[in-house]
Amino acid sequence: MTMLNPKKQISKPNTLIPNEHGFYGIYGGVFVPKELIVPLAEIADCFNNTAFTKEFQDELFYYYKNYVGRPSPLYYAANISCGGAKIYLKREDLNHTGAHKINHCIGEVLLAKKMGKKRVIAETGAGQHGIAIATAAALLGIECVIYMGEQDVKKEYPNVLKIKTLGAKVVCVGSGAKGLKEAVDAAFDDYLKDPETQMYAIGSVVGPHPFPLMVASFQSIVGKEAREQFLEQEGRLPDNVVACVGGGSNSMGIFSGFFADKTVKLTGVEPAGKGLETGLHAAPLAKGRVGVVHGFKCYFMQDDKGNPMGTHSVASGLDYLGVGPQHCYLKDSGRVTYRSACDDEAVDAFFMLSRKEGIIPALESAHAVAYALKLSKELGKDKSILVNLSGRGEKDLDYVLSLYGKKYGVDI
């Protein structure tokens, strides 16, 4: 495994770089069957030697600008800021496909093509990564297979239809808890069968090296843009940057723009589900222990014997038992503070943003909005908060309204 080669780079990403073995402190690494060691090393070499050449970057940024619609806007949400700190939203929900996921998906599929792969495979929870990979695969002319837990297929069925419409195959995973963990398990099993002709295009800053580095690097465009936009609009940096954390790709993306700015507080918001005290949550940084899962070392939800535990979140995209190694390192170092928001808080923020600003957020993003609303009241009018609005919420409407519609006055 090699690190980024600075001689080849034309635009070094402002993100955490692991050591030569893929570790961020004690987290990360490569814990996989021996059959995957060489294929993963080949992906790392291709990324290190190709992804930051002028040719690759020109193609990537052509698609970012003309296909994705970057830069995404920075919006001052005055109506929800009333009486507290100014809340700004980085509008990743306005990207093509409706979320931040397209940023790394185009990069991953471009790499797969450079390596001569015939197919990309991926897992998805809420469906946003599945849509983004299927979109990039259609754009670049490569076969695509998406693994999705049966529970999430039912919950996010509009996204399943979109994935199929884009020409990708959806494999419904019915084992275990039928969620994101099982989808990842199935995707890894498929990748293990044929790593020569296909590439696993992982959906977050998780998995064995080089996946966490790759995804974080492609997502760093979010933080770079947000920093420049905030300085332009406010003439200074934000006091706080807030983002939801499941695997952790959107938060790594926006945090990366501010790592060097010690006056800027960074806060990741995990899903507290029914409450951290209930065990029905997906908050490994708050309640997990260090171990190895899905090929890398991280905090993850496990029992006293080290076996993976079930998780719960109203947001499928956050319902994962582990978290990216960069986040584990940032938690231990203290550079990022991690908090949580429960299901009810996220749903309340979902409706508040919809009704106060006319923006329907993804349930995942609503966790960050929920925490920002509380923080805004604590800080006061002279402070500012930047929130990464990582996705839009049309995908969640059927599910949210079926469970919470009556409470919020919506008849269905």
From Swiss-Prot:
GO terms for cellular component: cytoplasm. The modification N6-(pyridoxal phosphate)lysine is found at K101. It is an enzyme of class 4 (lyase). Gene3D superfamilies: 3.40.50.1100. Keywords: Amino-acid biosynthesis, Aromatic amino acid biosynthesis, Lyase, Pyridoxal phosphate, Tryptophan biosynthesis. Pfam families: PALP (PF00291). It comes from the Bacteria. Disulfide bonds: none annotated. It catalyses: (1S,2R)-1-C-(indol-3-yl)glycerol 3-phosphate + L-serine = D-glyceraldehyde 3-phosphate + L-tryptophan + H2O. Its cofactor is pyridoxal 5'-phosphate. The keyword Amino-acid biosynthesis applies. Pathway: Amino-acid biosynthesis; L-tryptophan biosynthesis; L-tryptophan from chorismate: step 5/5. The keyword Amino-acid biosynthesis applies. One of its GO terms (molecular function) is tryptophan synthase activity. Its EC number is 4.2.1.20. Tetramer of two alpha and two beta chains. The beta subunit is responsible for the synthesis of L-tryptophan from indole and L-serine. Belongs to the TrpB family. This is Tryptophan synthase beta chain.
